[in-house]
């Protein structure tokens, strides 16, 4: 398949769509599928963390956030907010989820 190497992007994109719609469990599952397919997709792990918080899986979100911070120690909530051009309400929920999971704010 010519686009097989891009499937992680599709999975994470589907996760983002579910996150935008407030379907956090589905968002976490799809985004995690993308991360599993391409572990270097740190941006996908941001969705996994925030979606897990909003789905009520805070312990899992904290574990994933710690793992993400080991891979990307300079990541903060404010860095994540500046990285994407999503709607303000999406970004607010993302930032809230990341902060709740223990990501530094600045």
Where are the regions a protein language model picked out?
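Alpha-helical protein-protein interaction modules
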Residues: 1-106
């Amino acid at each position: 398949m010519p686009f097989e190497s891009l499937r992680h992007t599709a999975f994470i994109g589907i996760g983002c769509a579910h996150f935008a719609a407030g379907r956090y469990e589905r968002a976490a599952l799809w985004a995690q599928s993308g991360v599993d397919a391409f572990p270097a997709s740190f941006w996908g792990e941001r969705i996994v963390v925030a979606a897990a918080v909003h789905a009520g899986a805070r312990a899992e979100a904290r574990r994933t956030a710690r793992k993400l911070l080991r891979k990307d120690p300079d990541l903060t909530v404010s860095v994540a907010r500046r990285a994407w051009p999503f709607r303000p309400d999406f970004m607010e929920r993302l930032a809230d989820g990341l902060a709740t999971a223990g990501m530094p704010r600045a």
